[in-house]
Amino acid sequence: MSKLNKSIIAEFESAQITRQVPQFSQGDTIVVNVKVKEGNRERLQAYEGVVIATKNAGLNSAFTVRKISHGYGVERVFQTHSPIIESIEIKRRGKVRAAKLYYLRGLEGKAARIKEDLAATAHEKLARKTVTAKAG
């Protein structure tokens, strides 16, 4: 693909990315509010779990969230800029060293826990306090 075509595609993709997505990484526990259509009405469904993988590819970015539902591991892949995603909320920052956490599939119970990144959590709380103090 020529440089001109790549620049045109990059320009188009940047115009399509309209909303801000919070910065999260592997190991973080997040809540994804998804729009679900049932019949003729639409409602929000919360999907809470651990991010086990991310794919950063501009408009085609995606992330995989794993949760345990009724004793079974359930994974769901979300397109980061999909219109069905209403919001993404970060519940907890995890401290991991691997880029992909597929090894969690083989673990269960307490072995599948991820250590919390207390430094990142404290930094975010401090940032929120300063923003609130400036606004108030």
From Swiss-Prot:
Keywords, ordered alphabetically: Ribonucleoprotein, Ribosomal protein
Annotated InterPro entries: Ribosomal_bL19 (IPR001857), Ribosomal_bL19_CS (IPR018257), Ribosomal_bL19_sf (IPR038657), Translation_prot_SH3-like_sf (IPR008991)
Family affiliation: Belongs to the bacterial ribosomal protein bL19 family.
Function (record text): This protein is located at the 30S-50S ribosomal subunit interface and may play a role in the structure and function of the aminoacyl-tRNA binding site.
GO CC terms: cytosolic large ribosomal subunit
One Pfam family cited in the UniProt record for this chain: Ribosomal_L19
The keyword Ribosomal protein appears for this protein: yes
Gene Ontology MF term list: structural constituent of ribosome
Protein name per Swiss-Prot or TrEMBL: Large ribosomal subunit protein bL19
Coiled-coil blocks: none
GO biological process terms on file: translation
Lineage top rank: taxon: Bacteria
